[in-house]
Every structure is written in C-alpha cells, then in structure tokens.
Amino acid sequence: MKKLGVVEGFYGSLMSFSQRNSIVESLSNNNLNFYLYAPKEDPFIRKHIDLDHSKEWEEQFQNFCHNANEKHIQISAGLCPKTNDYGSLANKINKFKSLGCNHFAILFDDTEDYD
C-alpha cells in the first residue's frame, strides 16, 4: 500500500497535539494514510535521544497515535540519533512502540551538528 500524507519535519515552533490531530482529520478526509513525526525542534528525537519526553507529552502522543489509528492513518517517528548511540536509539524505538507508534525512519540529516 502506498504511503501518502505529511511529514512534520521542519525547523520552527513545535505544533500542538491539537494541531497534529487536525492534520490527521484532514488526512482522513482526503483519503491519505501517513504522518511522519520528525520535527527538527524536538530534542528528544534528535540530539538528546537518550532522554525521555515528559509523561504528559507521552500521554498526548499515545492519544494522537490512537486517534490516527482509528482513522487508518499510520504514524511513524523519524529519529535522528548520534551516529554511534545505538543503545539510546533502541530504547527510543521501544518507548515509541509502547506509545502506539510502530513505524520508524532513521534520519541522518544535520548530524554534523552533534559534535
């Protein structure tokens, strides 16, 4: 099945979960099926992949995934780890899986900033 949708992968202010859920609603209304969560300003999926989001964020993300799943929208997480930080990457993947996100992209853009 083709994946057609949006990538949240830009620099700038992070979107709220209300905004993300509105996008999921729009995707569903337009027969699209994919949302990649990969904002450049989220340090917990990039430079500080070894740290966890807040419990409140995790609860909101879990609800976001549930909402998307009900609308047949696949949520994927784009992770941009330090190139040698495999343990933290594995832990982050497991954390996202526990929140209902089971699809991932490993991104290597901007990794030179991690020195």
Language model: regions and residue ranges:
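Active-site cleft segment of glycoside hydrolase catalytic domains centered on the general acid/base Glu
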Residues: 110-115
